[in-house]
Amino acid sequence: MSKRLALAYSKKDPAGSGMAREIKDMMGEEFEISDKRCELIEVDREILYINGSQFEGFDYLAVLSRHSGTPNHPIFTAHVSGNFGRARYGGDHFKLSIAIPSLMKEYLISVSKRAEEIGYWVGFEPTHHGPTLDIPTAFLEIGCDETAWRDERGLRAAAESVLEAIESWKDGKFVAAVAFGGPHINDHFTRVELFTRFAIGHAARKLDAEWVDGEMVKQAVSRNGEPTGVAIVDNKGLKGEDRERIEGALRDLGLEVIRVKKILRDELGEEEGEEI
């Protein structure tokens, strides 16, 4: 039985609107890919502040969105929404949306095939900002400034990658994981997404680690969207007390805790993990 996928964008967002326009030109407003029935949905508000009522009856939500901020270079990014700590930009305090690890990974893999040719980078982002939704959600983005948000080549590359990702996305294809540590865009986690068998859903950056107690760890795992038995830790990207608390909570839940550099060494032959 096919599943319903909402491809949502805000009319206030030039990047999301541009991605949607490119998809509409290629596929129309409603279309089927593989076992997914897809529908483009425009919302009036900024996506960060919606409550999700627009998506009743859908099984999944992919948000076509702009990326803002770091690294001050054209980039394609993916992440799930939610707040490990206080909600500064939409959503609820200490609540995470349900993730779609495999779709996020497939988007990054697909867009990486197009990025270098047009001068873009690719980056995996941690869980951050609103909304906090009870529908499996993935933000698929282009950034990080007004120029990139309106760049026709970038928007076309993003749109093509969204469609390719939906086509490739299959349950159980990858090993779902949660991740902890490091900067906002963690090159190590990005390489895990692009080149290994693991698909990361929720990830807490070093900046949010102080909020990650046992309950937040449990929530990250339970709302990761796919059965999750692995946690990837950026050992040097966490304070000692935060790392001990988080790893203890993960082990209490029965998860296998793996250092990110071990994954890169074992699967890619990297000693330290190269930057991309």
Swiss-Prot record:
It catalyses: a D-aminoacyl-tRNA + H2O = a tRNA + a D-alpha-amino acid + H(+); glycyl-tRNA(Ala) + H2O = tRNA(Ala) + glycine + H(+). Its cofactor is Zn(2+). It holds the Pfam family tRNA_deacylase. GO terms for biological process: D-amino acid catabolic process. It is an enzyme of class 3 (hydrolase). Keywords: Hydrolase, Metal-binding, Zinc. D-aminoacyl-tRNA deacylase with broad substrate specificity. By recycling D-aminoacyl-tRNA to D-amino acids and free tRNA molecules, this enzyme counteracts the toxicity associated with the formation of D-aminoacyl-tRNA entities in vivo. Monomer. Belongs to the DtdA deacylase family. This is D-aminoacyl-tRNA deacylase. It comes from Korarchaeum cryptofilum (strain OPF8). The lineage of its organism: Archaea, Thermoproteota, Candidatus Korarchaeia, Candidatus Korarchaeales, Candidatus Korarchaeaceae.
